[in-house]
Amino acid sequence: MEYLAVSTDNRLISPSISPAFITPPHPAAPVGKAKLLNEHSRHEIDHWVTKFPPGRHRSACITALRAAQHQNDGHLTQDLLEAVAEYLNLPPIQVYEVAAFYSMFELHPCGRHHVSVCTNISCMLNGSDKIVEYVEKKLGIKTGESTPDGRIFLKREEECLAACTGAPMMMVDEVFHEWLTSEKIDKVLDELK
């Protein structure tokens, strides 16, 4: 097989793969609401679009929403949802459905740092209910709330964060903290600025 191109992640591309594979599904310069996405977000989205087959740019929706949420201090607005839809050339309802379905996305303003305590079976059997109580007491808030200073958002119950062997565990800004104790929790939360 003869290879004619190299993708952005240095994979060889066969001539049978259309150039759309390495070209984002949007114009070079964003127009309309897509302008709301900053350059870093657009670069991140473009990077992920190239990883999917031609015409499958919808598959990059989750990473596009993550980039948009990150640029907006941890939550998505209606305008950002529409910007992602326009940038990926998708119907806005498809983007909204993804954002509303996954617990990693917040559709309302919240604290800068996102804290998720896993409460699924492995964590529950290892005391996640006590972990949630401890974190709520330490922060002075309930799940689904942010600290008054806007520093920390304690997400609602998380069914599984896929780290069962490290139960009980929590995720803070996409970083796992396993085998939790009150001392570990204090250290992690106190280091958040």
Predicted regions and their residues:
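Signature of N-terminal electron-transfer/Fe-S-associated modules in redox systems
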Residues: 2-193
